[in-house]
């Protein structure tokens, strides 16, 4: 099935910094898997300090050739309750790659991306456009004249499982609610709003013309008190997020009842789906993580691989989102296939997703 997928969300420059050990002591809980906004503090030196409001600091000895930043980055909020003091880690390697959930979903779904960039002469915007071209992603952009493109410092502990994207934002946040209207009149099989501010996502998902509507939030969407996710949950056919994001949402039970399908992923613990069966009964399915015989190389993009494979499987098997119900067997089939896709992407350290044929082979 060839889906006409339209993805509204960011494409970032991801400056990926891989480190040699967990970002928090294992005794304090599972690996970090959340995004946080940051601001540059004092610059200079050989190390990079990530400091949250509670005073917890991760000090990173930077690898050879690191292009910056160095010095201190102030995180907007704490990254783990109970974490105090300093933790020293060493940078192993770094790379610049294409990032952003919009770019990820557009690639995984073979869809068209609609995103915001800075002006034509903005260096980061130029790099992002080049990376989109290199990945052969079809895209259209809104140029924001007075903001540089958004970018991310992504700190990954690789096999230890931490993924801490630190965002330097402003470009997409500057958009008006109707900025994407020229494209919202186009009919499509699937419309995805990925990691955009809630006020933008609500406008995109409530517009007519899409057979299926997916919301892929970031942590900031769950924390948004000015525009609650519950206020537009009725416009969402599939909401897919990780457990830490889900548990941050204050009115999550209201949201769970208003979306057609909720999927919560939990890394090596597997995933949970909540939905309504054709008999009108509430359905719940848990599926374990797909078995692996080696540690992950990188956990970045596992969530996008899972959600994109899950929804494409449902639609290819004839699910009708307008009905508001779905058969349990179909949900289980889609979750198993999605778990395999997420497991395969753990072997990648670069931008990309497993082909359907690779998923088929893994499931044999």
Question: What is the role of each PLM region?
Answer:
Residues 1-19, 33-37, 49-52, 252-364:
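Conserved phosphate-binding/catalytic region of the ribokinase-like
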Residues 5, 111-112, 139, 212-214, ...:
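Hydrophobic anchor at the start of a short beta-strand
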Residues 9, 115-118, 217, 266:
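Short beta-strand/turn micro-motifs composed of small residues
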Residues 20-29:
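Short Gly/aromatic-enriched secondary-structure transition segments
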Residues 35-151, 344, 362-363:
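Substrate-binding N-lobe of the ribokinase-like
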Residues 110, 157-160, 274-281:
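Short acidic-glycine loop/turn motifs at beta-strand connectors
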Residues 113, 143-144, 152-199:
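Conserved phosphate-binding/catalytic loop of the ribokinase/pfkB sugar-kinase fold
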Residues 188-261, 267-278:
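Conserved beta-alpha-beta core of the PfkB/ribokinase-like small-molecule kinase fold
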